[in-house]
């Protein structure tokens, strides 16, 4: 796609509305492709997509791998547990190894913030054409998850042609472990750029006041302010909400002192059918997964297809990641379809 200028996708902080629209439009096209009997297209035939996952992942890794294969790319899967990292090899040396194997796109996930950016800088320093896509770095960002969330929400409102304008003015509540969530950070950037009113809700220990500073960064391309509010009680955040996104409690990243107990968290911030009654009647529920049933939300809500968008999120993830791989991969001449 000749209009796409971004080489790497590392953060949504500087994404413009025009770029979001291009992702939505491209993803909608691939979503249609995935409905066909033959779900493969030759768009990235001859390209090599390497998933460098230094952190465990099921959904994201599988989704990117399937997306690459649907685009006819060759894939290489790196697993940190069986790699030379245990023998002292550095992360950048690992990236250079896969560069030497012919990688065109590197999809990078790491428990430390900034690793995808460091690999992207190294690829540029070496004068390569390699593209880097951030699949989640520490508590920093998770761009592809936020973009599939955006696509899912827009698809509910405008099924025929999802567009950014669909959610302008909509109230979207994000509830849960916001402090440790890279998903929350990327969603704040994307949803506020779309003109949605974003309401964050969590106990004070999981939602520092500093999150209000996101609103101080104007939307790229328009310069408009971002609409963001913080709530330390759930009901005010849910009142008249059109969409509610609940986040997993990341116990592996938090100290035990942040919460009295999981039972106490569910009592105050867990989503139940009764609590959703203050939302819009048409409210929809999202969760990036994996879900702690009975903690972040009740099992009956998760399985209620009239409310839950959790399975559509997973389905849409493949189309959105196809779009991202295509957009950055199409800048490589061999990737452009005839």
Swiss-Prot record:
Keyword flag Transferase: yes
EC number: 2.1.3.2
Record's keyword annotation contains Transferase: yes
InterPro entries for the chain: Asp/Orn_carbamoyltranf_P-bd, Asp/Orn_carbamoylTrfase, Asp/Orn_carbamoylTrfase_sf, Asp_carbamoyltransf, Asp_carbamoyltransf_Asp/Orn-bd
One GO process term, biological-process aspect: 'de novo' UMP biosynthetic process
Catalytic reaction(s) noted: carbamoyl phosphate + L-aspartate = N-carbamoyl-L-aspartate + phosphate + H(+)
Residues the entry annotates as binding L-aspartate: 87, 182, 248
UniProt: carbamoyl phosphate binding residues: 59-60, 109, 142, 145, 289-290
Signal peptide start-end: none
Domain of life: Bacteria
Keyword field: Pyrimidine biosynthesis, Transferase
One MF term in the entry's GO annotations: aspartate carbamoyltransferase activity
SUPFAM superfamilies: Aspartate/ornithine carbamoyltransferase
Pathway: Pyrimidine metabolism; UMP biosynthesis via de novo pathway; (S)-dihydroorotate from bicarbonate: step 2/3
Record's GO cellular component terms: cytosol
Enzyme class per UniProt: transferase
Subunit architecture: Heterododecamer (2C3:3R2) of six catalytic PyrB chains organized as two trimers (C3), and six regulatory PyrI chains organized as three dimers (R2).
Role noted for this protein: Catalyzes the condensation of carbamoyl phosphate and aspartate to form carbamoyl aspartate and inorganic phosphate, the committed step in the de novo pyrimidine nucleotide biosynthesis pathway.
Family (UniProt): Belongs to the aspartate/ornithine carbamoyltransferase superfamily. ATCase family.
Entry protein name: Aspartate carbamoyltransferase catalytic subunit
Source organism of the structure: Synechococcus elongatus (strain ATCC 33912 / PCC 7942 / FACHB-805) (Anacystis nidulans R2)
Gene transcribed to yield this protein: pyrB
